[in-house]
Amino acid sequence: MNFTGSPMNTFTSAFLGGIIGAVLMDITETAMARFGIRSGVNVSLVGRWFLGLTRVRLAHTDIQASVSMPHEAGLGWAFHFLIGGGGVALIYPAVLLAMDVTSPVHPILGGLMFGLVTSLLPWLVLLPAFGWGWFGRSGPAGANALLASPLSHIPYGIGVGAVMTLGSGFQ
C-alpha cells in the first residue's frame, strides 16, 4: 500500500471523510440509544458551548443549566460536521505526513484506530467543558460517555479511512 495522491487531495479527502464519518457517528449514536447507551451530548448543547466560546466562556458548571441561546441547534450541527467532523479529520493526514508515513498499515484499519483516538476529544475537552468532568463522570443521569464515545467514534474513523482510500491515493 502506497500513497500516490497529492497532499491537497489527501486533506480534501480527509475533510470529506470526516463529514461522512460524522454522519456514520450520528447513525451509530441513534442505534446505541435504543440499547440505552448515550453520551448525554446533543447538538443544541454543542451549539451552546460553541456560542459560549465566542464569548470567551470556555467551560460551564453544567451546560444543561446554562441559558439556551438563539440558533444553538443550527450552530451545533454546523460545528459537529465542519469542525468536529471535517476539521478533526485533517489531523489524520497531517500526522501521517509529519511522520513521513506513506500509508497506514491498512487505510480502513488506520481510520478505525484514528476514530478510537478521537474519543479522547470528548472525554478530555468537550465533556469537562460541559461541566461533566473527565470522561463525562458527572454527566446526565443514564449517560455513559465512557462507552458511548469510542463506540460512536469507530464508525467516524472508518468513514475517514474509507474516503481517504477512495479519494486521495491510498491503495
Language-model-derived ranges and their functions:
Residues M1-Q171:
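Juxtamembrane/disordered regions of integral membrane proteins
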